[in-house]
């Protein structure tokens, strides 16, 4: 089965604009787009929480998406496996995920910081997930 949005023709900048609109409508106070060689490589934003302002960096790994497209192309030559297409697909998937999360937020089942907790950045720009992965933070055992 091919990955979601593998046929998208929507320009990355249009998708980034849609993401920015979703985030700003739901409380983002600042949004920054990162680029490398003219390609969007990251999107960070700030939200206000009960503990103060928090920075969040969304995950995007176009190289990994490209590898998935290349692997899937072996079984389906209709799949376009270029870096440009992988970048479009990656950001479209992120946009769809954010859109779904904002729908859950609107039902008041969750708070913004719950949705983006793994992507909250520390003062060095490292996300909570990255710190966890490097064993810099551990969850306490509840059996103690």
What are these regions (language model features)?
Residues 10-13, 85:
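Intrinsic disorder
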Residues 12-30:
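Amphipathic alpha-helical segments
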Residues 17, 39-96:
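Long, continuous compositionally biased terminal/linker segments
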